Amino acid sequence: MKKEIHPEYVECKVSCACGNTFTTKSNKAELRVDICSNCHPFFTGSEKIVDAAGRVEKFKKKYAMQ
């Protein structure tokens, strides 16, 4: 790699809107994010499961596609 053309790689403090903070490496010293693994529904287990099968059956019944 050529010297003095790459951005400086420093330790980065990441702050989430939920209050969670963690450190990683980046070319910026501080990052602010809206959602992280601490508050994302996929990781917390509070995700909603859509009952698509019921909707399909309702559509077929409504338009007599059985």
UniProtKB/Swiss-Prot annotation:
Its cofactor is Zn(2+). PROSITE patterns: RIBOSOMAL_L31. Binds 1 zinc ion per subunit. Zn(2+) binds at residues 16, 18, 36, 39. GO terms for cellular component: ribonucleoprotein complex; ribosome. InterPro entries: Ribosomal_bL28/bL31-like_sf, Ribosomal_bL31, Ribosomal_bL31_A, Ribosomal_bL31_sf. The keyword Zinc applies. GO terms for biological process: translation. The keyword Nucleotidyltransferase does not apply. Belongs to the bacterial ribosomal protein bL31 family. Type A subfamily. PANTHER family: 50S RIBOSOMAL PROTEIN L31, CHLOROPLASTIC, LARGE RIBOSOMAL SUBUNIT PROTEIN BL31C. Part of the 50S ribosomal subunit. This is Large ribosomal subunit protein bL31. It comes from Campylobacter jejuni subsp. jejuni serotype O:2 (strain ATCC 700819 / NCTC 11168).
